[in-house]
Amino acid sequence: MGLTASARELWSKVDVLKDLEPRVKELMDAHEQKRELWMPSDFLGPDPESCPDRHIVEMRKRAKGIPDPVRAALALNLLTEEGLPHFHRLLAVYLGDDSFWREWNNLWTAEEDRHGQVLHDYTRDTLLFHQRKLEEMQFEYLRRGFHPSWDHDPYRVFAYTTVQERATQFSHAETGRRVAEYEPGLAMILDHVAREEARHFSFYRTIFEEILKRDPDQALHSASFILPSIDMPGASMSGFKDLADVIRRSGIYGPRDYLRIVQEQIRYWKIDNLDGLNELGRIAQEKILGIPERLRKIADYVETKSKAKTFSFEVVFNREFAMP
């Protein structure tokens, strides 16, 4: 029995990824050469001359002033980072176990693991959250799994990781700006995390650019399913919608930021200039080029319909706070 059309399509895409291995090695080498490897203890420990107990007391005193809406944003950012096992699994399915893809996936996993660790350690040391509730949320999030509709298509995986890494970078960076006046130490942590997310974003965006060069019609078709909207990894966690709403109302991350991200990728990948496409590619190209206007209308609608709301989260000690 021969392969089905969908199976042939999948194997064709896997072949393209294999062809990309030399480029993966180049990008990985460049990534490591530019990187300054940091560890969570670089930010959380006291200076050698300082008293450890006093260091913790002062850190808690500064963190106490962080507003609850920003704490809620930080909780969602942290839990999103703790979903790393889901992404390692998704990438490992297509990247294989004996290639530079495996080397990249392992490196990316090791780097990303520090993001969740440093944020988790910081919030525990500063008593920023109800720690038991945070851990329960993390447990349930991982237990529920992450099974997106695109996980059967390796091209969609890379289109998704491109925009998801950029969105995560935006959220960490803006959260860092919001906490800077209260706790410069946390702002520094978030700045380092955001800058590393930016480097990961650059890697995945370049990979998808290379896929477009090799298989433009199928690449555009895959991207046309991802770019209209993405479910962030934490969408399955309890309270996600309200946490995301707080982030939007705070101006940390929302529909207009996603619009910027999509516009940025359309420009970088030069989607409007691609020619020589077959019917599949032309239809996908037209769909993608129409996405920004649709996202703009969504952002306008959300902002117009938004009304003042009161929130409370167990992880932020059930304290109520109102937001316009």
Where are the language model's segments positioned?
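Non-heme di-metal
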Residues: M1-P324
